[in-house]
């Protein structure tokens, strides 16, 4: 077992505090619309330029192991805030540093760390309730656009694109951010259900000018098996031909004789058919086939439940208003499935999302909900260079997360003003003893830190602005873009309640753990450990003197 280095009490806390300050000082320069960029060196390729707090935090590793422990604990604040709300990482880091700096002084003065922690926890618990009371719903497009604009560093184009995307695919719809091909940001909306599987043969193409297959009011056959024998399909093909409608086949695979016969029939005009592979693999494929069946009012033909393809009838087939298939994707528009059945399926998947343990599973389940509930919107980010593209894409993703959080829990006054208002309301809050009262005061004072840092990053005097804002009420706050203090309307500069709440809770949680730390243990560097071992060995040789 490796030798350990151990530090106690104030020595441990001082080292930890140094690490906290290094990380927080690097992160907090990015806060607010006038926040600065941070350049991150990469082992290969061009350096990354970012204004994203969690991206900066994740890059920081300190040489001193005790200082690094402090930095890593604050890094946890940024990561947790990012996981919970997708944004607010810099705010959380600034709050954590403010609480830790002030409360460490109280601990050094001899106050009880446990009572200080209880005071901080009490203040934060009441503050969260006050934030909830202050929040107003964020439901109209103007409010959504404002939240997106603020979070994207006052980029109005991004805010409007996010609001438009939410308007088209709904609050539950999937909105993704991708690299664009030009200089302008674009919004691409895919209505209906789209999955990543294209036609199995180019001979199915009936729109040569677009290289796509378009089927109007088709029947849709869903089979959870490979189809290689055309005899299995003859009854269905004959029934569809009599009905005079096209047919889309979605199966695990269609190959050999079956595929060749379908191609020949299509080319001769006997029946208009297209075949694609089912999306996904294994259990996910079965689930997605069932989603398509629910959306189109069809039944999945599966031997697992005793259904045979030869016995399938028109009643087992799904239907849609239109299907578009190209080389890589299939889009089903306006399936005829019953609304109640679709909502039931969505509720079932939402339950699975709550129970999911991995982020990957959760993301895939959310995509399925979106495909059933509305559609998918893609925001394509335009930029002149790859470095700018990365930075802008990160900002758009943050804005998207902030907007979703605002829709979920409402908005409060942004720019740190909501925390100032909450702190003013809690001025008379008291604990069970004087040490707890100090903890409460520390938490309330720390709530000013985000506003102060935003003002500092604008090159103004934080104390003057903070005191002026404290003298007002409601949305009276500092506009960092125009660099002036003014009364704003409800949509002036809103911030997400969820992001503000998460930042405060995670900052207080980690600060509480750090102030109650009395001992830190880490491995000795290898050189120090080797020297220690060698000294021990030489000491044992003292007995050799008696042998001379």
UniProtKB/Swiss-Prot annotation:
Chain sites annotated for binding ATP: 30-33, 51, 87-91, 415, 479-481
InterPro entries for the chain: Chaperonin_Cpn60_CS (IPR018370), Cpn60/GroEL (IPR001844), Cpn60/GroEL/TCP-1 (IPR002423), GroEL-like_apical_dom_sf (IPR027409), GROEL-like_equatorial_sf (IPR027413), TCP-1-like_intermed_sf (IPR027410)
Coiled coil: none
Subunit structure, as described in the record: Forms a cylinder of 14 subunits composed of two heptameric rings stacked back-to-back. Interacts with the co-chaperonin GroES.
Compartment(s): Cytoplasm
Entry's Gene Ontology BP terms: protein refolding
Catalysed reactions listed for this entry: ATP + H2O + a folded polypeptide = ADP + phosphate + an unfolded polypeptide
Family of the protein in this entry: Belongs to the chaperonin (HSP60) family.
Gene Ontology cellular-component terms listed: cytoplasm
PANTHER family (alphabetical): 60 KDA HEAT SHOCK PROTEIN, MITOCHONDRIAL
Single annotated GO MF: ATP-dependent protein folding chaperone
Protein name in the entry: Chaperonin GroEL
Main location: cytoplasm
Stated role: Together with its co-chaperonin GroES, plays an essential role in assisting protein folding. The GroEL-GroES system forms a nano-cage that allows encapsulation of the non-native substrate proteins and provides a physical environment optimized to promote and accelerate protein folding.
UniProt keywords, alphabetically: ATP-binding, Chaperone, Cytoplasm, Isomerase, Nucleotide-binding
One family name in Pfam for this protein: Cpn60_TCP1
Enzyme Commission identifier(s): 5.6.1.7
């Amino acid at each position: 077992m490796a030798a350990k280095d151990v530090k106690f009490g104030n020595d441990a806390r001082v080292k930890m505090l140094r690490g906290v300050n290094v990380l927080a000082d690097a992160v907090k320069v990015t806060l607010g619309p006038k926040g600065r960029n941070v350049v991150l060196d990469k082992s290969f390729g061009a350096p990354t330029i970012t204004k994203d707090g969690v991206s900066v935090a994740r890059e920081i590793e300190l040489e001193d192991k005790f200082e690094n422990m402090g930095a890593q604990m604050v890094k946890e604040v940024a990561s947790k805030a990012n996981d919970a709300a997708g944004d607010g990482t810099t705010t959380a880091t600034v709050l954590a540093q403010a609480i830790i700096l002030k409360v460490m002084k109280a601990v050094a003065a001899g106050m009880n760390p446990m009572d200080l922690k209880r005071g901080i926890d009490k203040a934060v618990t009441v503050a969260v309730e006050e934030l909830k009371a202050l929040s107003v719903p964020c439901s109209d497009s103007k409010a959504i656009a404002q939240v997106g604009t603020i979070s994207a560093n006052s980029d109005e184009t991004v805010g409007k694109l996010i609001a438009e995307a939410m308007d088209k695919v709904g609050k539950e719809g999937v909105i993704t951010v991708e690299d664009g091909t030009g200089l302008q940001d674009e919004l691409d909306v895919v209505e209906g259900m789209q999955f990543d599987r294209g036609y199995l043969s180019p001979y199915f193409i009936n729109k040569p000018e677009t290289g796509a297959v378009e089927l109007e009011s088709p029947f849709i056959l869903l089979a959870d098996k490979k189809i290689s024998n055309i005899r299995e399909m003859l009854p269905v093909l004959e029934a569809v031909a009599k009905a005079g409608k096209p047919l889309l086949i979605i199966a695990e695979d269609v190959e050999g004789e079956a595929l060749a016969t379908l191609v020949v029939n299509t080319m001769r005009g006997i029946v208009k058919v297209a075949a694609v592979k089912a999306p996904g693999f294994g259990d996910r494929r079965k689930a997605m086939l069932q989603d398509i069946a629910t959306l189109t009012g069809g039944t999945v033909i599966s031997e697992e439940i005793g259904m045979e393809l030869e016995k399938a009838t028109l009643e087992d087939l799904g239907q849609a208003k239109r299907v578009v298939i190209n080389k890589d994707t299939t889009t089903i528009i306006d399936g005829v499935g019953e609304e109640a059945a679709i909502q039931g399926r969505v509720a079932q998947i939402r339950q699975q999302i709550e129970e999911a343990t991995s982020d990957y599973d959760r993301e895939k389940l959310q995509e399925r909900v979106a495909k059933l509930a509305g559609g998918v919107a893609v925001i394509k980010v335009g930029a002149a260079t790859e470095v700018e593209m990365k930075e802008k894409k990160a900002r758009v993703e943050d804005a998207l997360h902030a907007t979703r959080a605002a829709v979920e829990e409402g908005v409060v006054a942004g720019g740190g003003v909501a925390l100032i208002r909450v702190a003013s309301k809690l001025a008379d809050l008291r604990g069970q003893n004087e040490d707890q009262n100090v903890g409460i005061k520390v938490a309330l004072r720390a709530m000013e830190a985000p506003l102060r840092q935003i003002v500092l990053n604008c090159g103004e005097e934080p104390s003057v602005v903070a005191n002026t804002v404290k003298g007002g009420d409601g949305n009276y706050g500092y506009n960092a873009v125009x660099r002036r203090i003014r009364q704003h309307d409800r949509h002036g500069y809103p911030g997400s309640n969820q992001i503000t709440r998460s930042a405060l809770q995670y900052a207080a949680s980690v600060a509480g753990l750090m102030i109650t730390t009395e001992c830190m243990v880490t491995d000795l560097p290898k050189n120090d450990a080797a020297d220690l071992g060698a000294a021990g060995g030489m000491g044992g040789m003292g007995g050799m003197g008696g042998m001379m």
